[in-house]
Amino acid sequence: MWSLKSTLCIALLVTYSVAQDSTTVDTTAATTATGGTTATGGTTATGGTTVSGATTAASGATTASTCADDPNTDCTQYTSLCSNAKYTPLLQQFCPKTCGFCGGGSTAAPVQCVDSSTNCANWEKNGFCSSTFYDCANKKQYCAKTCKLCTTTC
């Protein structure tokens, strides 16, 4: 069985080697085959290896009632890739719980809303949060919690 780390390394190597041959390969929908299943039906790269256009369901596919991360994968190190469409098929297979791909909503740890400055309480008293002098992004950067901007897109 392939690990997520091995799969990502292979995907990057294929992308690199194909780029060196000046051939474009879309690896967005490619997943590593497991249990002897071969990914087929996509663009063929040098050497006749098909690397895109197919996804392979793992045996015992993840469902809402059995949603769990692969026990052999440290999914916490891949959380930054959860929203990257290029890695979605792999992360759905190996890290569905960590990345929030389980049915019934996200099971990923919620992002904590905090102030990065210790002066926010004083700044709020002085009108920082309601001031038009500072843009939303600055207010959110320093005092997201105090200014109640945690769920606001600036």
Curated annotation (Swiss-Prot):
Residues in ShKT domain copies: 67-102, 113-150
S-S bonds: 67-102, 75-95, 82-99, 113-150, 120-143, 129-147
Superkingdom to which the source organism belongs: Eukaryota
Pfam families: ShK
Keyword ATP-binding: no
Alphabetical keyword list: Disulfide bond, Repeat, Signal
Gene Ontology biological process terms, A to Z: innate immune response
Tagged with keyword Electron transport: no
Signal peptide positions (record): 1-19
Residue stretches in coiled coil: none
Protein name stated in the entry: Uncharacterized protein ZK673.1
Lineage: Eukaryota, Metazoa, Ecdysozoa, Nematoda, Chromadorea
